[in-house]
Amino acid sequence: MSTRLDFSKLTLMDALDLASLIEIEARNRYLEFAESLGTRGDGDAGAVFRSMAENETKHCEEIAERRLSLFGDEEARVTLDDIFDVEAPEMGDVRWNISVLKAYQLALYSEQKAFAFYDEALDYVTQPDVKALFQELRDEETQHVNMLVKIIANLPKSAEIELEDEDYDPNRPARDSFEA
């Protein structure tokens, strides 16, 4: 959607499908962050993002279960493109050499947008089970936001440094061709 999401026009199925896409995209992004940043032990950025990805997977499963029980195999009308108004950062924001700080900032931004999605959707969702699920997910987004704010506040200055390509040598002459 190129304009702001109009919640009044969403069906219950659309809301569930958007929620599912939000969680799937977040999981994939957090796995990408974890892979890019690496894991050196409990509590480092890679481990935090792996844990967040696991949490998003659980959210996906809860939403999928609810959707299946209500709508069966009915085809979704929303697509991955529709979530960029809701949670996902711009595609260019996620880079291979992202700094720890930037990764956490993007995660915070995404979690804040996810909170806003669930919070606003609650004004339109009337089905009791889905309303309860969205309230639970909104509350979890609040926890994620609070956690990320604390992590960011305690990051060392070095967290601002972007990753470097260890194979890159600025003193090695460039080659025009790799032919022998």
Can you describe what each PLM-predicted range is?
Residues M1-A180:
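Non-heme di-metal
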